[in-house]
Amino acid sequence: MSQEKASSPSGKMDGEKPVDASEEKRKEGGKKKSKDGGGDGGRAELNPWPEYINTRLDMYNKLKAEHDSILAEKAAKDSKPIKVTLPDGKQVDAESWKTTPYQIACGISQGLADNTVVAKVNKVVWDLDRPLETDCTLELLKFEDEEAQAVYWHSSAHIMGEAMERVYGGCLCYGPPIENGFYYDMYLEEGGVSSNDFSSLETLCKKIIKEKQTFERLEVKKETLLEMFKYNKFKCRILNEKVNTPTTTVYRCGPLIDLCRGPHVRHTGKIKTLKIHKNSSTYWEGKADMETLQRIYGISFPDPKLLKEWEKFQEEAKNRDHRKIGRDQELYFFHELSPGSCFFLPKGAYIYNTLMEFIRSEYRKRGFQEVVTPNIFNSRLWMTSGHWQHYSENMFSFEVEKEQFALKPMNCPGHCLMFDHRPRSWRELPLRLADFGVLHRNELSGALTGLTRVRRFQQDDAHIFCAMEQIEDEIKGCLDFLRTVYSVFGFSFKLNLSTRPEKFLGDIEIWNQAEKQLENSLNEFGEKWELNPGDGAFYGPKIDIQIKDAIGRYHQCATIQLDFQLPIRFNLTYVSHDGDDKKRPVIVHRAILGSVERMIAILTENYGGKWPFWLSPRQVMVVPVGPTCDEYAQKVRQQFHDAKFMADTDLDPGCTLNKKIRNAQLAQYNFILVVGEKEKASGTVNIRTRDNKVHGERTVEETVRRLQQLKQTRSKQAEEEF
């Protein structure tokens, strides 16, 4: 990495003149033809640039000059000594409106300064070159930190946004960081984006990175910004609909100026490698009746090695894609006549039902009672619960006898009716109601993605109605439940406690008491957990659980959420032990698998189609050595079928024995039972596994018994343990 010198209070790098490529380009008058891109059938850089770029830049430069003058005056008049506290408790002397986080980082070590992506001042992310304003705490975040990654990818999105304006000339919309990388949406009057354009876009991005364009932050009045962005109706919508303050911020890099809260990296040169890898179309703010936008996705890293690792990871993820494996293994499919609703074929249905049986077996041990509730409810139910006001767009609704009804998108309101259908006593609490009811959510067709984003699904949904003082024990039970299930799957997980948000409903004392009980439960649970302050729902604190799959991806499936508001909305009460008949229960919303469909997608990709024996839709393949053993092979298969195994036979006369065994291994049959004349005479089978481990000859009865044991214990390595 290049060594950089400390910045001056203005944010410029001492001894290094920031490159303003846009000014140089404008001086050229657009007479030189761009050499970037276009040679592979894709688009090339526009020449000249769209007029709005020059107009916007002229306006910005005037505002920036005024801002710099005001800042210099403020630094001269109002600057005073301040104390900056570092994470180790050490305090550093600084000057308000002059000293920047970057200067402090340089004072510690140049290596630290070079590797810092962004600062965190008083727990808020902050530009490295933005002067500090008062006494504060300071953290210096490297790329490994999640918040730093978000900033790094956000800055990369601006680089790509600049390239998109210079290539397409359209109107930029939103360009956020996402879980792995970033995207930018653009509205084009004509035409669209092609993957053939990626090369010219990447070439231009590399040029922008090489220029080390400084990221500049500027606070501007809303009405001025409406004038600056009058060419772009989408930015004007954001200003009019989302900005409720007199001023907001824009950021500039080169000729790009965009509405943005920031912060950003110091300059574009901090992005060491950038790849554009995907494009799609979408609607403005996801609404099907709004304009169609072009979306381009990218990824970037501070080290080319990380990009190579990412590309390798993408290839592995592609090979594990549940949609491909589902097709290849004949587990499930989708059809245009019912978008977002999966058709589970017999072998896929086996996985689905086995997962539900697993959860049901745990319900019996843990005191849950399974219920069945309606699929369709009058809209009055959803008005009472509050979902109609906030969620009706995502519900399938229709008229019945002049009244509005809807398919249920969740089970909790129906469970509230169950609790309320007769008087309840403290003796009945905790009441644990479980429901595998079918749910429907009206997802946009463009958002539907295999089994991970569907319209029709089922959850291992449960609601615990309990007294306030029972919360701690119930949460302990929920945590133990999820550990039991996830250990069977081989998932590790991480836990976050999300506490009271700024805009919460209810009594603060109830919140404090509940949060304390959640903390106690987590501490006793014994697994590492982190506090996520202020990130709870408005109606109660929650525990967020993320599982980690075989290739290192995290997925949120389980839910443990306290709810103080739904019992109030439905006026749920019980008679307490001291005779108070207005006592209010607390609801614990709880799921372990979450959506069964989504969990099947995760498990498919986690195992790469190599299902563990207990869950496998192809547990046993019986292979006869020749046609004279076909009848015996069918008899053996029937014995395994009767013992409730997923068993098949390969009677194909056109295949050799070795070919049949290889086919069974490729189809991921856990156990392959070869039968010849010897086995036929002695009532035995010769056992090998899909990984070609040979277990030798056993009687059919002995084999059935052993496989039943392995199935009942849900062994992760049944083939080895046999």
Curated annotation (Swiss-Prot):
Domain annotation TGS: ranges: 78-142
EC number: 6.1.1.3
N6-acetyllysine: residues carrying this PTM: K242
GO molecular function terms noted in the UniProt entry: ATP binding; identical protein binding; threonine-tRNA ligase activity; zinc ion binding
Phosphothreonine carried by residues: T245, T452
InterPro entries per UniProt: aa-tRNA-synt_IIb, aa-tRNA-synth_II, aa-tRNA-synth_II/BPL/LPL, Anticodon-bd, Anticodon-bd_dom_sf, Beta-grasp_dom_sf, TGS, TGS-like
Any one Gene Ontology BP term: threonyl-tRNA aminoacylation
Listed Basic and acidic residues bias regions: 13-27
Catalytic reactions of this protein: tRNA(Thr) + L-threonine + ATP = L-threonyl-tRNA(Thr) + AMP + diphosphate + H(+)
Post-translational modification: ISGylated.
Location relative to the cell: Cytoplasm
Region named Disordered: 1-48
Extent of Polar residues compositional bias: 1-10
Family of this protein: Belongs to the class-II aminoacyl-tRNA synthetase family.
Protein name: Threonine--tRNA ligase 1, cytoplasmic
Organism taxonomic ancestry: Eukaryota, Metazoa, Chordata, Craniata, Vertebrata
